[in-house]
Amino acid sequence: MKSKPAIRRILATLERLYPHDDTCFLNYDHAHPWQLLFATILSAQCTDARVNIVTPALFSQFPTLEAFAAANITDIEKAIRSTGFYRAKAGHLQQSARLLLANHGGQLPSDIENLTALSGVGRKTANVVRGHIFDIPSITVDTHVMRISRKLGLTANTCPVKIEFDLMEQLPKKHWIAYNQQIISHGRAICTARSPKCENCELKKECEEYKCKIQPKAH
């Protein structure tokens, strides 16, 4: 676990590099918040960029939950094929539409329990919805948050749920949503999975991996 001064330095650096706003990386119509849920389901094992290419046509073809619920499943599959795992995802979209209509009057629930009861929705997807739709402080553990949080010494766990709770324990609640966005931005720009730009990283002094593996090689 990280010291409080180190955490303050990390958060201050992230805020300076990536000033927080509430813009979601996934595009959706704010008048139809269920679209963010569906876009996040599609983002599993797929890039946000690809999802943002697919969803405009998808939501034009199926503009309502009722349209998804009544659709021929093969039509949904065709529309989302390029996102990968399209058969499973199509089933999740249709079943979630039906559950939202049957159990929630077509409205998104805000609590973890009801969100994760929807088809294809785990804590990551639920927390995206909670943070962006309901402005509820939430930690979203995607691959960037998992990788970089471990490097920074904020967690030693590999289980996303355990990482989520490690971060919740250490980070001030007011920073939770911003941390998600900022770490994802940092993971895309600097701390990439395959070829991290360690020498250009302004977090390297706080990075346990850099201290252990990179610095000794320079001596």
Labelled PLM ranges:
Residues 2-218:
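Catalytic cores of DNA base-excision repair glycosylases
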